[in-house]
């Protein structure tokens, strides 16, 4: 599944971390200062990102990238029928179905979230060919670490 993710996504990937993304951003800032160029950053943190993953869309995405139907079905069965309740000072509310989100603490959740987020970014038009900051012949317009995204560009 890592082959579906671009280099700009460092979240939950072996040998990658937040330090890499911070170093990339610092390097861009230093080069911009050195060459007296204006650059812009937009920092985005998706609130409750893991809880917002729509299951039906996730299964569609997995199918589109070529995940075998048997595996998608297995993942669907893991998520199906999940229920929750809320306990408060006066008791608990009725149980309700959970129709969104990837399981917190599940070893597959980070990978599933990354694939879901990548689909959103691709559909937002943030491909490498779009405007960004040219680094080694490539346009880099965003850096990501799981649900944290930094959009970048210059005037």
Predicted region positions:
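Nucleotidyl polymerases of mobile genetic elements and RNA viruses
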Residues: 1-155
């Amino acid at each position: 599944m890592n082959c579906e993710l671009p280099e700009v996504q460092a979240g939950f990937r072996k040998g990658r971390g937040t330090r890499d993304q911070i170093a990339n951003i610092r390097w861009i800032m230093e080069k911009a200062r050195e060459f007296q160029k204006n650059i812009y950053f937009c920092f985005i943190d998706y609130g409750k990102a893991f809880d917002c993953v729509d299951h039906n869309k996730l299964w569609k995405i997995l199918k589109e990238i070529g995940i075998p139907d048997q595996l998608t079905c297995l993942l669907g069965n893991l998520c199906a029928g999940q229920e929750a309740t809320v306990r408060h000072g006066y008791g608990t509310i009725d149980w309700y179905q959970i129709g969104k989100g990837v399981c917190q603490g599940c070893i597959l959740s980070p990978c599933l979230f990354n694939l879901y987020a990548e689909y959103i970014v691709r559909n937002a038009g943030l491909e490498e060919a779009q405007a960004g900051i040219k680094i080694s012949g490539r346009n880099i317009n965003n850096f990501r670490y799981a649900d944290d995204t930094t959009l970048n560009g210059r005037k």
